[in-house]
Amino acid sequence: MEETESSTQTPVPQHGISLASYPVRAVIRMRRKIRTLKKSRLQLDLTGGRSLDSAKASLRRQISMDRATLFKSSTYEKQQYFNFDTPTLEKLALNSQIRKRNRKKSRHVLYPGNVRKCLPVEHKSKAKRCLLLFIGIVCFQILNAIENLDDNLQKYDLDGLEKTLQREVFGQKRAIEKLMDHLQDYLATHYHNKPLVLSFNGPSGVGKSHTGRLLAKHFRSIMDNDFVLQYYTMHNCPNENDVTQCQSEMSGLISEMISRAEIEEKIPVFIFDEVEVMPVALLDVLHRYFQLNQSNEYLNAVYILISNIGGNEITKFVLQNASNDFLNLPQELHQIVISSLQKHHSLWDVAEIVPFTLLEKKHILDCFLDELLREGFYPDHSNIESLAGQLRYYTKENKEYSISGCKQVVAKVNLLQPYT
């Protein structure tokens, strides 16, 4: 009765093995195969007459080979076949992370067991040392050049010149600053690509010729008299009939002085006054020395041209801008003066214009005070006011500008001498 009941029951399916993974099933099959091979080979070896030891060794080799095959099959991943499906962003991110992780894994350095462990020596390139040496040489040359510039400026004592001009030239602060800027830039080195040509322009009595005399005195004290030339047109070439002779004399003086200066590595200074009355033939001679297409020694020279050309234009400009600070309008004033100079001669195309403006009454008082002290008079303020009141002035916007500048100051002071 019990047998019939048990036979009628439905058999329970064996899910234990079917649920196992593929490597587990492979292990089970291999174990069964090993048992069968053991039995079959032992029987064959015993029946064939082989020794038991050789049979065991053969069996061990077979077992080891089977285990290796089993390990490969258990770690084998399912092959991925190529298809044309576009990978998703998640797969791409996962692959990039795997690659980065593999890249970060540092390779271990294998050291022999009987030596000291140390990292391999990195061979440094010698180009870096050469580059550092080259940079050092360039920096040294730059510092040396800067020191040479300072030496040149000290040789000409431009600081002392600037102090002298500020002390003895009144009412021309802007002109002095511009003059010193040009001299400092040019005299800082001995090698140039063009000569320095400066043009002092302004009305009469504002200090142009006085500045020229101070420049000549200063450079004669720094250099010899052989390297400074003062040329007054009315004195050196008074007759128009002697223009040809004046041309040869001027050319000879300039060439000889430049040659001597080049030998001693000095820069000569040529000061030409009263240029407004200089004949055109002499202006042409000067113009040839201002050109760029000449030998190097002629490029190392300073030429100063002093004239009243453009004085009327400067006077009108100052009176029209009396209410403003016309010192802040240098470009407009420069254009007015240069247009007047270019009508006179083309040599001013290469000149640096330094305009001298009108002097106010306070500057005339300074001129009288300086002249009185120079002549040994007691500087009485009331006496100075009386002398300054004898001059004529332009009156504009509550400002008084002297018509004749400081030109009559010396004559007025000389009139006081008989009464002392």
UniProtKB/Swiss-Prot annotation:
Keywords: ATP-binding, Membrane, Nucleotide-binding, Transmembrane, Transmembrane helix. It is a single-pass membrane protein. GO terms for cellular component: endoplasmic reticulum lumen; membrane; nuclear envelope. ATP binds at G202, P203, S204, G205, V206, G207, K208, S209. The keyword Transport does not apply. GO terms for molecular function: ATP binding; ATP hydrolysis activity. The chain crosses the membrane at residues 130-150. PANTHER family: TORSIN (PTHR10760), TORSIN-4A (PTHR10760:SF1). Belongs to the ClpA/ClpB family. Torsin subfamily. This is Torsin-4A-A. It comes from Xenopus laevis (African clawed frog). The lineage of its organism: Eukaryota, Metazoa, Chordata, Craniata, Vertebrata.
